[in-house]
Structure formats: C-alpha cells, structure tokens
C-alpha cells in the first residue's frame, strides 16, 4: 500500500491516536490492555521526543502510529549512552501486512539516525 503518508503526530491527533492504539492492540497476541494509557504516560514524560512520535495517514484517517522515547544504557565497560525504545507501534487491523508498520519503522530509524542516535530497541 502506497497511498498513505507519514508525518509527525500533532496535538490534534491525540484522541485519534489513543483510539488507534487501543483498537490495534485489541487483536494483538501479546498485550496488557492499557497500551494506549502507556503511550499517554510516555508522551508526558521527560524522555519523550515529539519528532519521533509519528502517524501514518490515508484519506484523513490515521491508520498507524509509532513512538520512540529515550532510554539510558549502561554498557559492561561502565560507559553510558542514550538509546531509543520503540513502543508502541500500532497499525489498524485492516491495514496490516501492507507495509504501514515497516514504513513507520523505516522513517523512525531514518530520523533517529539523523538526530544522532546509534541504537534503537
């Protein structure tokens, strides 16, 4: 599927993103049931990076979402660095297996590299 665009999430998207995450995880094999609330908490936290919270959109409808947040990493040699965590990554059921999730990941990784991040988990 190529008829969608990826863009940064806006404040106007937040209610729709909340519902998208909730609905997408209803059919997930592994879920807690509160992934949408987890995303809200991440967005309110100090490790949130607005540029790395993106949506996939087609015909004015949000069909996918990805969020990456910072996390400190302590290496075995004692050195520390900042990496990124991907969570959540959501795609509406009817748009799965069409490349939406892959496109969100690719764009997220591209932007993360541009911003100087060297690791994403």
Stretches with model-predicted labels:
Residues 14, 18-19, 25, 29-67, ...:
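Active-site rim helix/loop that mediates acceptor-substrate recognition in acyltransferases
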Residues 72-86, 96:
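A conserved beta-turn-beta hairpin within the catalytic core of GNAT-like acetyltransferases
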Residues 86, 91, 97-110:
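Conserved acetyl-CoA-binding loop-helix of GNAT-fold acetyltransferases
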Residues 105, 110-121:
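Conserved GNAT acetyl-CoA-binding A-motif
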């Amino acid at each position: 599927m190529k008829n969608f665009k990826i863009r940064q999430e806006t404040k106007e998207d937040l209610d729709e993103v909340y519902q998208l995450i909730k609905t997408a995880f209803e059919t997930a094999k592994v879920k807690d049931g509160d992934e949408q609330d987890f995303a809200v908490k991440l967005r309110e936290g100090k490790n949130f990076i607005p540029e790395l919270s993106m949506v996939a959109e087609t015909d004015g409808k949000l069909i996918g979402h990805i969020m990456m947040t910072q996390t400190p990493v302590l290496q075995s040699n004692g050195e520390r660095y900042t990496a990124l965590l991907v969570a959540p990554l959501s795609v509406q059921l009817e748009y799965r297996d069409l490349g939406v999730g892959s496109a969100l990941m690719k764009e997220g990784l591209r932007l993360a590299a541009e911003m100087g991040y060297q690791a994403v988990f």
